[in-house]
Amino acid sequence: MARSFYSHIKEAWEDPDDGKLAELQWQRKQDWRKEGAIERVDRPTRLDKARELGYKAKQGVVVVRVSVRKGTARKSRFKAGRRTKRQGVNRIGRAKNLQRIAEERASRKYVNLRTLNSYWVGEDGSQKWFEAILLDPEHGAIQNDDDLNWICDDSHKNRVFRGKTSAGRRARGLQNRGKGTEGLRPSTNADKRNKS
């Protein structure tokens, strides 16, 4: 049976540091480092992944590449007094994953668009790059698309800031089910309130 074009792309991206893709990624990162933190792109870098997540090559659909610095939260040192245990600076991490941060930054720049989803496209020693798929809820092409028009409803405003995307749900622990997830739903904060 003949393999699809997308299956070849997917196989290449399983190990992007090997084969022909490695050279291409090396050249891409050289260009990406010179660009801004948020850049609109004409077409997805990973077409198979973008299509899986709902991308369509039509008006009203925008793809944005976002770079996010890797590492811990870079907290500034407290100026006021604290006991040693509460003086933590160096090993304080972020509560959100980098992919969710990238989605939020893209959404803040393109305030009239709504974030559908995002995916990883590369990283080096200091930063990670993600591509976010954004939709225009006011565009007729989106409103008339049976697969995408759900996002036009007002209940999906600012969905990325409420942890409604895949990356947001992952950070909230909602991709897990069964034993051990009792405190995750409806949210960790709500669970703490109910127990107090």
From Swiss-Prot:
SMART domains found in the cross-reference section = Ribosomal_L15e (SM01384)
Keywords assigned by UniProt, alphabetized:
Ribonucleoprotein, Ribosomal protein
Q: What GO biological process term is on the record, naming one? A: cytoplasmic translation
Instruction: Show the GO MF annotations.
Output: RNA binding; structural constituent of ribosome
Which Cys-Cys disulphide bridges does the record give?
Answer: none
Listed Gene3D superfamilies:
Ribosomal protein l15e
Q: Which GO terms describe its cellular component?
A: cytosolic large ribosomal subunit
InterPro entries to which the protein is assigned, alphabetical: Rbsml_eL15_core_dom_sf, Ribosomal_eL15, Ribosomal_eL15_arc, Ribosomal_eL15_CS, Ribosomal_uL23/eL15/eS24_sf
Q: Which Pfam families match?
A: Ribosomal_L15e
The signal sequence is: none
Please verify whether the record's keywords include Signal.
no
Region feature (Disordered):
162-196
Task: Point to the regions of Basic residues compositional bias.
Answer: 162-172
What's the family? Answer: Belongs to the eukaryotic ribosomal protein eL15 family.
Q: What is this protein called?
A: Large ribosomal subunit protein eL15
Q: Which gene encodes it?
A: rpl15e
